[in-house]
Amino acid sequence: MTKLIIEWQNQFGGWYRFQEQHHEPSAYRTGKQRAKRTGKRHRLVDTDGRVLDIVEP
């Protein structure tokens, strides 16, 4: 089972870790809800650093 890392992007383009989850649908849902709530872009990254998805607010 792989870990998914949810990261958010600040106004200067830097990416910062928010949290880790194991279940991909739940990680996507969390990223989507938080992107909508904060108005900031979020992305899902695996442990090897590969970007799996980018969520726009």
Q: How should these model regions be labeled?
A:
Residues 1-17:
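Short aromatic-glycine-(Arg/Gly/Cys) micro-motifs in beta-strand/loop hairpins
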Residues 21-46:
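A short, charged, amphipathic alpha-helix used as a generic interaction element across diverse proteins
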Residues 8-11, 28, 32, 36-37, ...:
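Solvent-exposed, well-ordered amphipathic alpha-helical segments
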Residues 13-19, 50-54:
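Surface-exposed loop/edge segments in extracytoplasmic proteins
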Residues 1-5, 33, 43-45, 51-57:
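Short N-terminal "domain-start" leader segments
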